[in-house]
Amino acid sequence: MKREFDFQLDAKRFLPLFVSFFIPWLILEVLILVQSRRTETATASTASIFLLLLLVAALFGLTVLFYIPILRKLVSAVFFNNEPFHFEGLIGRFFGLNLLGIFLSVITLGIYGPWYLTRICRYLVGVTSYKEQHLEFTGKGGRLLLIFLLTIAIPMIPLVLVQTRLDPTISASPLAVNPFQAFMLQLLALLIFFSVFAAYLYAIYRWFFTNLRYGDKVLSWNSRFWPSVSLIWVQMLLSFLTLGIYLPAAYIKVYRYLAGHTEIQTEQKQEGRLGFRGQTGRGFGLLWGQTLLSAVTLGVYAPWAMAKVGKWFLSNTYVESS
C-alpha cells in the first residue's frame, strides 16, 4: 500500500508574509554588496567596516524573525496520507537560540558551530508534529563536527595551499607554471572540490534524516558511501559543464536517489520505504519555468512558484509499506 505526501500552500495568503520579508531582505543584500566593495579598498575606514557588520547583523535578525512565521506556513501546508503536519515554533525562543549560538560560535572561533546547528535542528524538528505527536531529532554536535572536519576542513587544506602558491599577490614565491599548467591545476582543484562537496552533502543528509524519530519509527538509509557520492558528483559536474542549465534535472535525480534509498524502520524491522515517481523531464520544465516567472516578476510570483514546485515534489513522493 502506498501512502502519499501532498503540499497545499495557499500562495495568495502566503504572499503578504513573503513580500514583508523579501523586500527588506533584497534591500539589505544590495546594501551589503555595495558596502563590502567599499571596505575592500585600501582607504576603508573603521566606520565603513562597522556599517558593514551592522548591515550583516540586520540581515541576520530579519532572517531569524521571519524564519518561524514562514516555516509555520510551509510546514502546515505539508500533508501525509491526507493528514497535515503542524508547526508550533516561537519567534522569541528561536531568536534566543540563534543569538546564543552565534555568540558561543564567535568566542570559540567556530568550534561551537556544529552544536549550534544541532540545537537549531533539534528545536525545529521538536516543534513539528503529525497527528498530535511530535517528531524528535537525536543528532549529536560532535558527529556534525567530525563531518565538517572530514568532508570540508581537512580536504580543503591542500586546495587552499595550491591556490595560495599560484597567486602572486599572496605568495612571495609563486609556483612557476605556464598558463596551460595553471588551467589544469585549477580544473583539478575544481573537480576535487566537487568530490569534497558531494561527500559533504551525503554525510549531512545521512546525519540529519537518520536521526529523525516519530514515535517508535526511525529513518535509515540503505545506500553506501561511494555510489552515493559518485552520483552527486556526476550531477554537479553536468550542471557545471552546462553552465547551470542542467541543474534542475540534477536536483531531481539526486532527490529520487535519496528518497529511493530511505527506509522506515521499527525496532530493526523495515516497515516501509520512500519513493519518488516524478518524471525528470516534467520536473525540469517546471523548475525552469517557475524560476523564470519569479525572476521576471522580481520575486512577486515566488509564492506561486513555491506552491507549484512543492506540490509536484511532494505529491510524487510516497511511502510504500513493506
Question: What are the roles of these predicted feature ranges?
Answer:
Residues 1-83, 89-133, 137-243, 251, ...:
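Short, small/hydrophobic-residue-rich motifs at membrane-helix boundaries and re-entrant hairpins
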